[in-house]
Amino acid sequence: MHYQYLVVGAGLFGAVFASEMTKLGKNCLVIEKRNHIAGNIYTKEEKGIQIHQYGAHIFHTSDKEVWDYVNTLAEFNHYINSPVASYKDELYNLPFNMNTFAKMWNIKTPKEAKEKIQEQIARLNIIEPQNLEEQALSLVGTDIYEKLVKGYTEKQWGRDCKELPAFIIKRLPVRFVYDNNYFNDPYQGIPKGGYTGLVEKLLDGITVKLNTSYEDYCRKNEQTGLFESVDGEHTFEKILYTGMIDEFYHYQLGELSYRSLRFETEVLEGEENYQGNAVVNYTEREVPYTRIIEHKHFEFGKQPDTVITREYPQDWEKGQEPYYPVNDDKNSMLYEAYAELAKKEKNVLFGGRLGQYKYYDMDKVIRAALNMVQEELNN
């Protein structure tokens, strides 16, 4: 059978692209190396609770068109992301706001908070930050940095803040209002019943092959110039590849760096409410995990049991899941070299977090996929 597109990866980018192309009468086949669709936004039910299998995913956007788009796929609840940070048995509200400062310094007014932060910054006299530590200190002062930034960041990156480049933290949002809403976007929520159903709706009527890797499934027929399945049954005019761009090119220019995560999920039977919040960050270096997620709170659950997940950052090695691109100068230059190779491809498109080696929020993934569909039509 002949398909216009082979879509490699059934995550959000691939699913939106395949869905839109199918609506336009293009024939798409989707392959996915995992045993499930939805990529890292995959959710599954346990004890009546939707489990965010690959870490917390909270949908938020300022893009009204994208918000309207996702609301055609699922009904969203009114969840607001308001994480809490735990530091040496003290709890602080995030993002940094008046609730945080009132707890930290026993103050009440924005004027007092601003004076406290400015006083600490002035004392340090950092003119030109040379590393992440100096950058963070020059933005928020000593107390916030030591208690809420340093340990968490070092766990995330596996390196001391003095060894990390300053650009990783371009800004640290500091709000002088009593407001624990983490995001500034006007639209926010979580699809009722989880994200997997949303992606299922996108892929409705489209053939999806699970447990199928690109390397094992597809080859290029040098005579016809077309891509085909290794059994010769299917041919494809074009490929949308949402896997790792360096892997597509067999690492011929070198390996890009990623950070990975390990998740430890525990069912707590008979415990109705473990921590009272969906996300609690652990900001001291000595605690090995960065956060604990209690999944039921994403959907205001009242189940008699609860499920928690501890999140451990780790170095990435081949065979592990790559979660975050390490966008330092070295890796950015290497990605640009791969992007130059990609530009020469007539019939291969690269999309998503791994295909474009960038950290993408979900709304930006959808916008980028919709833009790619438009570009394809214009071509």
List PLM regions with ranges:
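N-terminal Rossmann-like FAD-binding beta1-loop-alpha1 element of flavoenzymes
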Residues: Y3-V30, V373
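Dinucleotide-binding Rossmann-like beta1-alpha1 core, especially the glycine-rich loop
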Residues: K47-R123
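Glycine-rich FAD pyrophosphate-binding loop
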Residues: S19-K47
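Short hydrophobic core segments
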Residues: L6-V8, I31, E233-D246
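C-terminal segments that line or cap access tunnels to active or ligand-binding sites in enzymes
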Residues: E237, E247-N379
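Active-site/ligand-binding neighborhood in enzyme catalytic cores
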Residues: K88-Y92, N99-F236
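Short, well-ordered alpha-helices that flank and scaffold nucleotide-derived cofactor binding pockets
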Residues: S19, K23, T43, D204, ...
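Short, well-ordered alpha-helix to beta-strand connector turns
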Residues: Y3, G25, I206, F236-E237, ...
